[in-house]
Amino acid sequence: MDKKKKIKEISTTFTLTTFEINEIEKQKKYYENSRSVSIEALKIVQKKRGWVCDQAIIEIANILNLNPSEVESVATFYSQIYRQPVGRNVIRYCDSVVCYLTGYEKIKKFLEDYLFIKIGNTTVDGRFTLLPVCCLGNCDKAPTIMINEDLYSHLNPDLIPNLLELYK
C-alpha cells in the first residue's frame, strides 16, 4: 500500500465517538453561536485524544454548521489546543517580557539540555513536550512554567530535575 493511499484511508476512517458528539451537542445550548461552541468542542476532542487532528476539525465544523477554516482558526489561536500529538506531560514555559527579565532563558536552556529536545518537540520516550507560551498570568512570581495544569513559580534550573520527577 503506498503512503498516499494509507494517509487517505486513515483520514476517511476517523470519526468522533458518540460520546464526543453528544458532549458537543450539549454545549450548543450554552452559547449564542456555533463559533463560540467550537472552543469547547475542540477541548472535548482533545481531552479524549490528546490532540486535535485535521479530520476532527472537519467533523466539528460539520456538527456546528461552520466552515472548517473557522474551527481551524479557533484551534490555532489558542495555545492549549494541540494540532499535533504531544507527550504525556506538556511543559509550557512563559516567554513574556517579565519572565525574560527574570531569567526564563536559563530555564528554557536547562529544559532543552536536560530533556534533549528543542522547543516544540517531544522527548523520545513521549514523556514531555516543551512549548512556549506568551504569558501564564503569573508575572509577579516569574519565571514561571506550567506542567499540564500545574503552575510553578520563582524557578531556577536547580529546581527543575526534582520537579520533572513528579511527572512519570
Swiss-Prot record:
Its cofactor is [2Fe-2S] cluster. Its EC number is 7.1.1.-. It catalyses: a quinone + NADH + 5 H(+)(in) = a quinol + NAD(+) + 4 H(+)(out). Transmembrane segments: none annotated. Binds 1 [2Fe-2S] cluster. One of its GO terms (molecular function) is NADH dehydrogenase activity. Pfam families: 2Fe-2S_thioredx. PROSITE patterns: COMPLEX1_24K. It is an enzyme of class 7 (translocase). InterPro entries: NuoE-like (IPR002023), NuoE_dom (IPR042128), NuoE_N (IPR041921), Thioredoxin-like_sf (IPR036249). The keyword Iron applies. The keyword Transmembrane helix does not apply. Belongs to the complex I 24 kDa subunit family. Composed of 13 different subunits. Subunits NuoCD, E, F, and G constitute the peripheral sector of the complex. NDH-1 shuttles electrons from NADH, via FMN and iron-sulfur (Fe-S) centers, to quinones in the respiratory chain. Couples the redox reaction to proton translocation (for every two electrons transferred, four hydrogen ions are translocated across the cytoplasmic membrane), and thus conserves the redox energy in a proton gradient. This is NADH-quinone oxidoreductase subunit E. It comes from Buchnera aphidicola subsp. Schizaphis graminum (strain Sg).
